[in-house]
Amino acid sequence: MKHARQAKILEIIDKEVIETQEEIADRLKKAGMEVTQATISRDIKELRLIKVMTEDGRYKYAPFNSTDNTVFNRLMTVFSKSYVSSDYANNIVVVKTLPGMAPAAASAIDSMNYPEIVGSIAGDDTVLIVCRSEKIAKEFVEKLSKLAKSDDK
């Protein structure tokens, strides 16, 4: 069921300009699949869907292609330019960003698809990242610091 639903979501966003999760739910319902907003949200994350600008200036869902270096490089640039500092406590990493930039930084971190990351939550200027262990958290802080320094601010 999950794979069929996710395949249908990919088919829908390939054929139509879909701007909201509600539109995805509506199209799935028309295809005979009842889903909740939470399920759609999880599917979007698992499918690595991102919002891209259309020619008319609207934003639509599209698959994130990890081989698309342009998008990946943009996300890494956003991260490095928004990064202020990072630290860890036990298996939790806290990333400080410029005001208003935490959601973009979290998106960049999520797009890295590190298996050692359980999940992340973004506020206004802080990203909370849950790692699988304290050792991994320490290593991840070092990775983030190197990544932020790799691009001249």
From Swiss-Prot:
<keyword id="KW-0963">Cytoplasm</keyword>
<dbReference type="InterPro" id="IPR036388">
    <property type="entry name" value="WH-like_DNA-bd_sf"/>
</dbReference>
<comment type="pathway">
    <text>Amino-acid biosynthesis; L-arginine biosynthesis [regulation].</text>
</comment>
<dbReference type="InterPro" id="IPR036390">
    <property type="entry name" value="WH_DNA-bd_sf"/>
</dbReference>
<dbReference type="Pfam" id="PF02863">
    <property type="entry name" value="Arg_repressor_C"/>
</dbReference>
<comment type="similarity">
    <text>Belongs to the ArgR family.</text>
</comment>
<keyword id="KW-0804">Transcription</keyword>
<dbReference type="GO" id="GO:0051259">
    <property type="term" value="P:protein complex oligomerization"/>
</dbReference>
<dbReference type="GO" id="GO:0006526">
    <property type="term" value="P:L-arginine biosynthetic process"/>
</dbReference>
<dbReference type="InterPro" id="IPR020899">
    <property type="entry name" value="Arg_repress_C"/>
</dbReference>
<keyword id="KW-0028">Amino-acid biosynthesis</keyword>
<dbReference type="Pfam" id="PF01316">
    <property type="entry name" value="Arg_repressor"/>
</dbReference>
<dbReference type="GO" id="GO:0003677">
    <property type="term" value="F:DNA binding"/>
</dbReference>
<dbReference type="InterPro" id="IPR036251">
    <property type="entry name" value="Arg_repress_C_sf"/>
</dbReference>
<dbReference type="GO" id="GO:0034618">
    <property type="term" value="F:arginine binding"/>
</dbReference>
<protein>
    <recommendedName>
        <fullName>Arginine repressor</fullName>
    </recommendedName>
</protein>
<keyword id="KW-0678">Repressor</keyword>
<keyword id="KW-0805">Transcription regulation</keyword>
<keyword id="KW-0238">DNA-binding</keyword>
<dbReference type="GO" id="GO:0005737">
    <property type="term" value="C:cytoplasm"/>
</dbReference>
<comment type="function">
    <text>Regulates arginine biosynthesis genes.</text>
</comment>
<keyword id="KW-0055">Arginine biosynthesis</keyword>
<dbReference type="GO" id="GO:0003700">
    <property type="term" value="F:DNA-binding transcription factor activity"/>
</dbReference>
<dbReference type="InterPro" id="IPR020900">
    <property type="entry name" value="Arg_repress_DNA-bd"/>
</dbReference>
<dbReference type="InterPro" id="IPR001669">
    <property type="entry name" value="Arg_repress"/>
</dbReference>
<dbReference type="GO" id="GO:1900079">
    <property type="term" value="P:regulation of arginine biosynthetic process"/>
</dbReference>
